C-alpha cells in the first residue's frame, strides 16, 4: 500500500492522533494576514498545542504558533494570536454542540494549501487514557509484524 505524496501539506499534528480518538473531521479556511500567509508558505507553523474555540458565533484557532515573517517589518503579526476559521453556520453549530460535551476537544490536524488558500483540517476528538495509547501502540506493532512476516 503506497502512501500518496502530498506536496501541499504544510504542517501536521501527529500528536493529536496519538492523544485523541478522532470522531469526525472538517475542512476550514483560515483568515490570515499577509505576513502570516508568507510564514505559512515557508512552513513556519506549529500545531502541537493548538485547539479550536467557538464563541460569538464564530470559530477561532487558538494557540497555534505561526512564526514572524523574516523579511517582515514593524507590521509583523503576533505569533500566537487567535485566527478566525472560515466555516458555514451549520458547521459551527455542529462543532459548538460537540464542544459542549464533556471530554470532547476540537483540534487542528493538518494545515495545507488548496488552490492557493491555506486550509486547516480540524478534528473532533475524545481524549485517550494512558491504557488506550498503549493499546494503540501494541496494535500498530502487531500490524507491522504481520506485514513484515507475510510481505504485505
UniProtKB/Swiss-Prot annotation:
This is SsrA-binding protein. It is found in: Cytoplasm. Belongs to the SmpB family. Its main location: cytoplasm. Keywords: Cytoplasm, RNA-binding. Required for rescue of stalled ribosomes mediated by trans-translation. Binds to transfer-messenger RNA (tmRNA), required for stable association of tmRNA with ribosomes. tmRNA and SmpB together mimic tRNA shape, replacing the anticodon stem-loop with SmpB. tmRNA is encoded by the ssrA gene; the 2 termini fold to resemble tRNA(Ala) and it encodes a 'tag peptide', a short internal open reading frame. During trans-translation Ala-aminoacylated tmRNA acts like a tRNA, entering the A-site of stalled ribosomes, displacing the stalled mRNA. GO terms for cellular component: cytosol. One of its GO terms (molecular function) is RNA binding. InterPro entries: SmpB, SsrA-bd_prot, SsrA-bd_prot_CS. It comes from Lactobacillus helveticus (strain DPC 4571). One of its GO terms (biological process) is trans-translation. The keyword Cytoplasm applies.
Amino acid at each position: 500500500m503506497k502512501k500518496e505524496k502530498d506536496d501541499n501539506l504544510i504542517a501536521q499534528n501527529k500528536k493529536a492522533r496519538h492523544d485523541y480518538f478522532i470522531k469526525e473531521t472538517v475542512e476550514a479556511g483560515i483568515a490570515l494576514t499577509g505576513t502570516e500567509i508568507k510564514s505559512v508558505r515557508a512552513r513556519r507553523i506549529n500545531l502541537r498545542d493548538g485547539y479550536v474555540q467557538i464563541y460569538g458565533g464564530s470559530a477561532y484557532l487558538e494557540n497555534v504558533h505561526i512564526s514572524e515573517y523574516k523579511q517582515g517589518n514593524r507590521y509583523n503579526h503576533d505569533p500566537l494570536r487567535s485566527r478566525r476559521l472560515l466555516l458555514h453556520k451549520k458547521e459551527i453549530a455542529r462543532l459548538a454542540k460537540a464542544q459542549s460535551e464533556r471530554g470532547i476537544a476540537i483540534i487542528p490536524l493538518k494545515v495545507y494549501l488548496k488552490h492557493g488558500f491555506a486550509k486547516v483540517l480540524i478534528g473532533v476528538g475524545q481524549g485517550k487514557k494512558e491504557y488506550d495509547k498503549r493499546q494503540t501502540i501494541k496494535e500498530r506493532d502487531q500490524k507491522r509484524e504481520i506485514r513484515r512476516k507475510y510481505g504485505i
